[in-house]
């Protein structure tokens, strides 16, 4: 394997990891000591997330088009997509089951003795109103954009992915005649990633604003009011990450702990912003740096943001059973299995919908009919603090899924993977945008003519 000469590490103060840690600590301090000022910092976090979101659609489009158009065997695209969906279904089912088992073991809602009739349901009306849950048919139809530009304007990931797949297939059919378009799209992707590199420079500001707002608005005290559920949920996420995902990673030849260290900067940004989308472009590039082929990365990561929400799956089963425990609503084994079965369907049907956690939970509780929907009011206040664990688990789960599916399809360079996880490719691991210019000089210009 050919490796580049080792590069000098950045000084600690210039490390994005260090900057985000300091920003999060400063945000917590500001929100705690000056709550009103902390609340006013919300635009900083919102602005950073919007900056990243504006780049997601074009990056996914360029990455997937280049990956598909440059492939010699089109059957691999279908195989990759099929294996990814199979993996998503199996692992997210494991997440639901683990959440169900551990919430029964920890019993976080036992002893609260809440009368559901006394709960104020006004606060959850926005999540439980008619038409909030998207049907399977509507979900499938929503994947098809009304216009080509509309998908990009609205930032609909699955719609952009569909357009990219179709465009990539069509460009592949052109063979050598499409080389000019292929080269233009590929070079555009490098420009887009360079822009993401610029945006990431302000990630500490975004993390600071989001954390200051959260602590300022909700207060540290609200962390303790329903701390037992939060503690059980965070512990369950850790068990899932190091137990289930750790075992999957080990079977496929890499360490989940080393992988977490590799994406530590992205995890900190997600911790600050509570949005796994805030690092989607950077995660795609980092997966490529680990040796996963562009096609696999472009298909698995965007799809995983809709179908592989492991942290959300754990949250759904734990929250539903917690409400039952808190309101003294007995649930038989059959009723819990029914709850699990309904969640297998509803957790996919609301993918990509704002507030999907509450919407899915409300729809599921209504469908099962055993647990009072009014109990959602119990967890509304701490949901914001559990969103970090959901987003972090989702991010790690999608990263592991990408590497696993890439290995299944022989699209993973294991030597490059081990080098990246062992910090042998330090520059690419920690500052991927710094090597974009070097990569631009080695773009596969002949890929299109070979495909033809």
UniProtKB/Swiss-Prot annotation:
Gene Ontology BP term (one): L-aspartate transmembrane transport
Region (Disordered): 426-452
Transmembrane stretches, start-end: 18-38, 51-71, 83-103, 151-171, 191-211, 229-249, 304-324, 337-357, 359-379
Basic and acidic residues: compositionally biased ranges: 431-442
UniProt KW keywords: Cell inner membrane, Cell membrane, Membrane, Symport, Transmembrane, Transmembrane helix, Transport
Superkingdom per UniProt: Bacteria
Its membrane topology: Multi-pass membrane protein
Localisation: Cell inner membrane
SUPFAM superfamilies named among the record's database cross-references: Proton glutamate symport protein
Alphabetized Pfam families for the sequence: SDF
Single GO MF descriptor: fumarate transmembrane transporter activity
Cellular compartments per GO CC: plasma membrane
Keyword Cell cycle belongs to the record: no
PROSITE patterns in UniProt: NA_DICARBOXYL_SYMP_1, NA_DICARBOXYL_SYMP_2
Keyword Transport in record: yes
PANTHER family reported in the protein's UniProt record: AEROBIC C4-DICARBOXYLATE TRANSPORT PROTEIN, PROTON/GLUTAMATE-ASPARTATE SYMPORTER
Family membership noted in the UniProt record: Belongs to the dicarboxylate/amino acid:cation symporter (DAACS) (TC 2.A.23) family.
Function: Responsible for the transport of dicarboxylates such as succinate, fumarate, and malate from the periplasm across the membrane.
Protein name: C4-dicarboxylate transport protein 1
Protein's organism: Polaromonas naphthalenivorans (strain CJ2)
Gene encoding the protein: dctA1
